[in-house]
């Protein structure tokens, strides 16, 4: 069972990740925001690609639910931390971070 401390530790372990205020939440960004932690620290919103969101929500509906708004249609997904193992949380955050990570600069020849 994961908690907010696990979430924060894992999210900040990715290269280039930082924690920033975001309205009433805490945002975790690399190049762009890939996750936010709720004020009560019981849930988090994680940014998947829409094609990644559907199977996540179907396989683990107790852990993942698409946000019921335009952000949800873009892949933002609510994760209930207590319903996730630490390994599941890490896999979800890594998936989101990969989309937000700084792009490698092209090498000059």
Where are these predicted regions, by residue range?
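Charge-dense, helix-prone N-terminal extensions
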Residues: 1-109
